[in-house]
Amino acid sequence: MPKPTKGPRLGGSSSHQKAILANLATSLFEHGRITTTEPKARALRPYAEKLITHAKKGALHNRREVLKKLRDKDVVHTLFAEIGPFFADRDGGYTRIIKIEARKGDNAPMAVIELVREKTVTSEANRARRVAAAQAKAKKAAAMPTEESEAKPAEEGDVVGASEPDAKAPEEPPTEAPEN
């Protein structure tokens, strides 16, 4: 059963808070980042992340659940067509809050909330690890044929004893250079 928000609400009544969060989420999905007060950004973060999780699933039921909260169909289409698939391989943490300097007029603490647009650090690290492993494997494969040719046993057509270190080649008499 839904419980009302305890403590102070943004804008006074619960209906006004729902409207504020819906409008902030619409602006966030439309522009990618917004500047707002820090309490509004903190309240918006779980609200927006739940909507993105619905968009990742992509079913008609999820679209209708999001349409109950966001009234702009263009933003909902963007959410389901672009934002949801972008975060398909990410489990949460779709938004980032960055504190900025206080607002000049009333000294309210301000923050920027934005969608995280770069891939995760771990996926970048995994990609770098795979590339390094592939390069090491290629280097090892390139080194293997030279080792095989050095350690190759003598075949039937080879001269026996020519590769032995004790075998001496027949000595030829030294030839003297013609004098001019």
UniProtKB/Swiss-Prot annotation:
Entry keyword rRNA processing: no
Entries under SUPFAM superfamilies matching the protein: Prokaryotic ribosomal protein L17
Pfam family, one: Ribosomal_L17
Coiled-coil spans in chain: none
Region (Disordered): 134-180
Keywords: Ribonucleoprotein, Ribosomal protein
HAMAP family: Ribosomal_bL17
Name of this chain's protein: Large ribosomal subunit protein bL17
